[in-house]
């Protein structure tokens, strides 16, 4: 890794802060734009042109970037995302490099878990602390409708592999789509609780892959409450720090 940049003439700012004084201590790094799924709310079914391998950040560049963040900018947590980060064969090397930093940050991964069953142990040994798995349905037909790929069995195998490797806690990120999987939410929560997984319903982002995003069709927090209230007793919890939507 190269030397740190000269900050002599820069303001003495020990942390990343916005104009409201809120400090950013989390760093999200997309390791690739490629994904082996084609979720309807994220990518078009075909026609995607992805970056070439030599256009992606190298292991050394990623570790150097994180080192600058933790040593100069107050970064405490690093999350690797994509695309699908597991499609990088050097992911273990990336995580090991970051975990070996003198000021080691918390290291997490957002993944669809395809192939994780074969790598979970190595990733944990490299220094991975925890994972978030993107999973919108445990019903094969619904999963394939949303992802355009018949790969639910591989996602579930990946989750089982992560559990066996001790990557706790495992959080499941679910995007609810009206008329497609929203009615499955109570059963999905049951499935997660049976496996000691933490379910998080996340807001659909307006990536507009198929030019169908409309605010009026979004599932709200109130909608989620109404779906779960008949089966569960719900109680408010403390707000996460500064919202922390990506934790």
Q: Residue spans of the language-model regions?
A:
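Short, conserved loop/turn and helix-capping segments at secondary-structure boundaries
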Residues: 56-59, 149, 215-218, 222
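Canonical Radical SAM [4Fe-4S] cluster-binding loop centered on the CxxxCxxC motif
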Residues: 19-60, 73
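Auxiliary Fe-S-binding modules of radical SAM enzymes
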Residues: 1-27, 190, 194, 201-207, ...
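Radical SAM/AdoMet-radical enzyme domain recognition
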Residues: 59, 63-79, 87-195, 200
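Conserved G/P- and acidic residue-centered "switch" motifs that form tight phosphate/ATP-binding loops
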Residues: 84
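Conserved N-terminal glycine/acidic-rich loop preference
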Residues: 5-24, 40-41, 75-79, 123, ...
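Generic beta-structure capping elements
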Residues: 32, 44-45, 134-138, 202-204
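A short acidic, helix-capping loop that chelates divalent metal ions and anchors anionic groups
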Residues: 47-52, 118, 139-146, 208-212
């Amino acid at each position: 890794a190269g030397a740190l940049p000269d900050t002599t003439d820069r303001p003495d700012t020990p942390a990343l802060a916005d104009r409201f004084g809120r400090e950013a201590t989390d760093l999200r790094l997309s390791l690739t734009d490629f994904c082996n799924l084609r979720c309807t709310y994220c990518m078009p079914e075909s026609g995607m042109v992805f970056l070439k391998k030599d256009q992606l950040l190298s292991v050394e560049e990623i570790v150097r970037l994180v080192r600058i963040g933790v040593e100069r900018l107050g970064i405490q947590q690093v999350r690797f995302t994509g695309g699908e980060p597991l499609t990088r064969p050097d992911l273990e090397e990336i995580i090991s490099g970051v975990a070996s930093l003198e000021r080691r940050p918390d290291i997490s991964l957002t993944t669809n878990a395809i192939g994780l069953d074969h790598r979970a142990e190595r990733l944990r040994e490299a220094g991975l602390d925890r994972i978030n798995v993107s999973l919108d349905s445990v019903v094969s037909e619904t999963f394939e409708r949303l992802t355009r790929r018949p790969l639910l069995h591989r996602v579930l195998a990946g989750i089982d592999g992560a559990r066996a490797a001790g990557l706790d806690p495992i959080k499941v990120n679910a995007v609810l789509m009206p008329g497609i999987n929203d009615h499955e939410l109570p059963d999905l929560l049951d499935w997660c609780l049976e496996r000691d997984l933490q379910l998080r319903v996340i807001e659909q982002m307006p990536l507009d892959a198929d030019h169908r995003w409309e605010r009026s069709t979004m599932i709200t927090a109130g909608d989620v409450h109404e779906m779960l209230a008949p089966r569960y007793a719900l109680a408010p919890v403390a707000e996460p720090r500064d919202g922390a939507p990506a934790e």
